From Swiss-Prot:
GO terms for molecular function: 4-hydroxy-4-methyl-2-oxoglutarate aldolase activity; oxaloacetate decarboxylase activity. InterPro entries: RraA/RraA-like, RraA/RraA-like_sf. This is Uncharacterized protein MJ0644. It comes from the Archaea. It holds the Pfam family RraA-like. Gene3D superfamilies: Ribonuclease E inhibitor RraA/RraA-like. SUPFAM superfamilies: RraA-like (SSF89562).
């Protein structure tokens, strides 16, 4: 059964590139509300989650995680009252992650070195940014369930991000969400055609 699920999920992952994050959100994927891309024109990226739980001043654990996050999407829960006053990710981490083949990073907290991240065009999604840095404490937990923006993310969950934000999909739900997204996209295509023919969106949607 696990082998069959792996095959099904693998095929579904190849189809993800055909949808936007809003498509997938409408189809049932869970949004990480408040998480935004550092790159304003961020293209669609996706991958399996490798999760990290750290204190607001510990960037060491994230640096450690990069070493075994190839083809993964790092998702970090940042805990503590200082999570919006201290950055746990920056330009050097982004450079290292890009070279190591990390798909992207989600930080439920702050990042810095925004200009460096943009120059690298490395997919970083975060709540905010600030100049203050934490410390290389390396006291966090890796590959545990984390609470990111109120959503429980587990290792292996599918993370999808673009210029609109980030959503999370459980592997077992991926085929259903893909099918829902196909139907949604087809409905939108038909609506778009009617608008181009001169109809008002209000009338197309039967709004009084």
């Amino acid at each position: 059964m696990k082998v069959l699920l792996k095959i099904i999920v693998g095929r579904a992952m190849n189809i993800l590139k055909n949808f936007s994050v809003p498509n997938l959100c409408d189809a049932g994927a869970k949004p990480l509300n408040g998480i935004k891309p550092i790159l304003e024109n961020q293209k669609l990226v996706f991958g399996e989650a490798i999760t990290v739980k750290i204190s607001y001043n510990d960037w060491g654990t994230l640096i450690k995680t990069i070493s075994f996050a190839k083809n993964k999407f790092i998702v970090a829960e940042v805990v503590g009252e200082g999570k919006y006053e201290t950055a746990v990710w920056g330009g050097l981490a982004s450079l290292n992650a890009k070279i190591k083949g990390v798909r992207g990073v989600v930080i439920d907290g702050c990042v810095r070195d925004v200009e460096d991240i943009k120059a690298l065009k490395f997919p970083v999604f975060a709540k905010n940014f600030c100049p203050n840095a934490g410390k290389p404490l390396n006291l966090g937990e890796i590959n545990v369930a984390v609470n990111c923006c109120g959503v429980i993310v587990e290792p292996g969950d599918i993370i999808v991000g673009d210029c609109n934000g980030v959503v999370v999909i459980k592997k077992e739900s991926l085929p259903e969400i893909i099918e829902n997204a196909k139907n949604i996209k087809e409905k939108e295509r038909k609506i778009r055609e009617r608008i181009l023919r001169g109809q008002d969106l209000r009338d197309v949607l039967n709004l009084e």
